[in-house]
Amino acid sequence: MFVDECVVKLQAGDGGRGCISFRREKYEPWGGPNGGDGGRGGDVILLGDDDTNNLVDYKYQPHWNAERGEHGLGKDQHGKDGAHRVLKMPLGTVVIDEATGKPVAEVVEDGQQIVLCKGGNGGWGNTHFKTATTRAPKRANDGHPGERGTYRLVLKSIADVGLVGFPNAGKSSLTCLITRARPRTAAYPFTTLHPQIGIIDYPPDRHGRRRLRLADVPGLIEGASENRGLGHRFLRHIERCALLLVLIDMAGTDGRDPREDYKHLLRELELYDPALLKKPRLVAANKMDVEAAAANLSKFKRRHRTVDVLPLSCLTSEGIELLKKELLKRVTALRGREKVSPRARD
């Protein structure tokens, strides 16, 4: 199951209570105070994890607590600090405070740590309250409560390339060919029911390993901006992409017109977020192995003269390697070598 939005309730650990204790020894039955401090409560920490790809763990277990600190003991023994609660988050997770509706954190890097709820400090033992006039204080502090809160987690995947297209245009097949992802493929619409994040590997150069992240979102349909179909719900997963890859069925399957398909796709993207149309985009003309595709491609180019089009066939793999090279070249130019998914891992 894919979950990209859920609500969690988090509670950091309370601090331990300080101790009231006095030194009692054989030759000193009325020694001074020696009560230890309480331990600090554990924090709730979000950890960016590139191997985690959705929020399903938090959908069905929304309550997460860190350990409380242990109480102080006599002989100046401080209580043990509570263990932190570390929650692994997929990259691109936005944390929204349910009370205010405002974003409070964002997980963007593998290994990034965000302390969302801080544990409470431990209370002081009675040793701290000894003065020149109060030699035997019978006073200690309770621990401070840990922070708590209710948060909405919203996943906006981080990818270099966003793949969009109408259902049955061949997006899942293309994703299988150019990445290590293995989405379901079949000859019917909506085989992709949730976003797929795939890694496109390239031969290493003198700078080391090269790779891109590609986000394949469920197929759009006309009216997606009005929440028809599946694609609109998942369009937020391409908001951060450097490049949009628009896949068009150039064979005109089921009497469709590739030129109109492209027009409607752009319209749905604009209705969802006009900023998406400002992103650089590349059109991949699929199903060029079909006889009618060549004529349709000529008509498409005449209408959309300024659009960069790469013909290919997912069935014969024609044009696939050229597409991979073009994606790397364009994303590298847009983001710079250091920003091309440096943390994508096996």
From Swiss-Prot:
Q: Choose one Gene Ontology CC annotation of this protein and give it.
A: cytoplasm
UniProt lists the family membership as follows: Belongs to the TRAFAC class OBG-HflX-like GTPase superfamily. OBG GTPase family.
Compartments in which it is found: Cytoplasm
Q: Which GO terms describe its biological process?
A: ribosome biogenesis
Q: What is its EC number?
A: 3.6.5.-
Q: What is the lineage of its organism?
A: Bacteria, Pseudomonadati, Verrucomicrobiota, Opitutia, Opitutales
Primary residence: cytoplasm
Function, please? An essential GTPase which binds GTP, GDP and possibly (p)ppGpp with moderate affinity, with high nucleotide exchange rates and a fairly low GTP hydrolysis rate. Plays a role in control of the cell cycle, stress response, ribosome biogenesis and in those bacteria that undergo differentiation, in morphogenesis control.
**What does the record give as cofactor?**
Mg(2+)
Q: Tell me if GTP-binding is a UniProt keyword of this record.
A: yes
Q: Name one GO molecular function term.
A: magnesium ion binding
Q: Entry's PANTHER family?
A: DEVELOPMENTALLY REGULATED GTP-BINDING PROTEIN-RELATED (PTHR11702), MITOCHONDRIAL RIBOSOME-ASSOCIATED GTPASE 2 (PTHR11702:SF31)
User: What is the gene called?
Assistant: obg
Which named protein is this?
A: GTPase Obg
Report the residue ranges that make up the Obg domain in this protein: 1-158
Instruction: Please tell me where GTP binds in this chain.
Output: 165-172, 190-194, 216-219, 286-289, 313-315
Q: Where does Mg(2+) bind?
A: 172, 192
Q: Which residues form the OBG-type G domain?
A: 159-332
**Which cysteines bridge via disulfide bonds?**
none
Q: How does it assemble?
A: Monomer.
Keyword set for this entry? Cytoplasm, GTP-binding, Hydrolase, Magnesium, Metal-binding, Nucleotide-binding
Q: Which Pfam families match?
A: GTP1_OBG (PF01018), MMR_HSR1 (PF01926)
